[in-house]
From Swiss-Prot:
<comment type="similarity">
    <text>Belongs to the RNA methyltransferase RlmH family.</text>
</comment>
<dbReference type="GO" id="GO:0005737">
    <property type="term" value="C:cytoplasm"/>
</dbReference>
<dbReference type="GO" id="GO:0070038">
    <property type="term" value="F:rRNA (pseudouridine-N3-)-methyltransferase activity"/>
</dbReference>
<feature type="binding site">
    <location>
        <begin position="123"/>
        <end position="128"/>
    </location>
    <ligand>
        <name>S-adenosyl-L-methionine</name>
    </ligand>
</feature>
<dbReference type="InterPro" id="IPR029026">
    <property type="entry name" value="tRNA_m1G_MTases_N"/>
</dbReference>
<protein>
    <recommendedName>
        <fullName>Ribosomal RNA large subunit methyltransferase H</fullName>
        <ecNumber>2.1.1.177</ecNumber>
    </recommendedName>
</protein>
<keyword id="KW-0698">rRNA processing</keyword>
<dbReference type="InterPro" id="IPR029028">
    <property type="entry name" value="Alpha/beta_knot_MTases"/>
</dbReference>
<keyword id="KW-0489">Methyltransferase</keyword>
<dbReference type="InterPro" id="IPR003742">
    <property type="entry name" value="RlmH-like"/>
</dbReference>
<keyword id="KW-0949">S-adenosyl-L-methionine</keyword>
<feature type="binding site">
    <location>
        <position position="104"/>
    </location>
    <ligand>
        <name>S-adenosyl-L-methionine</name>
    </ligand>
</feature>
<keyword id="KW-0808">Transferase</keyword>
<comment type="function">
    <text>Specifically methylates the pseudouridine at position 1915 (m3Psi1915) in 23S rRNA.</text>
</comment>
<dbReference type="Pfam" id="PF02590">
    <property type="entry name" value="SPOUT_MTase"/>
</dbReference>
<keyword id="KW-0963">Cytoplasm</keyword>
<feature type="binding site">
    <location>
        <position position="73"/>
    </location>
    <ligand>
        <name>S-adenosyl-L-methionine</name>
    </ligand>
</feature>
Amino acid sequence: MKCLLIATGERVPTWVAQGFAEYHRRLSYWLPLELVEIEPSMRGKNHDPQRAIEDEGRRVMAALPKQPYAVTLDVKGKPLNSEQLAQRMEHWRGLGRNLVFLIGGPEGHSQEVLNISNERWSLGPLTLPHMLVRLIVVEQLYRAATILTNHPYHRGK
């Protein structure tokens, strides 16, 4: 199974890149994950945000592998606690398909991207910087892996 994290945005802050690299390294023993960065569209007072969303959506669609199982990070998605995410990870691994996590830009995902999503995952009702979301996602995937392998990292229930 190939696992991708397709994230809109480039040039993340150093501390985000360092945190992502650390959890990516830890996760790689259990679930090899490839980060694919999508160039964000121009934004500003003279740019149409809907057009930016559509442009980014086309770039995301072009980056998808064939027949992926797409999990879209979306505020309207299903919130999961760590144990529930671990259960979903076990399910996703058993599908035998390429697993793709999709992180949109500041305004979210295009309708085209939402339409191909097999699942929508919400990190909760908070508004988070989309650059920070990639770090949170990789840490949560690592946490899910430690739950499944009974590693002491997760100190939940």
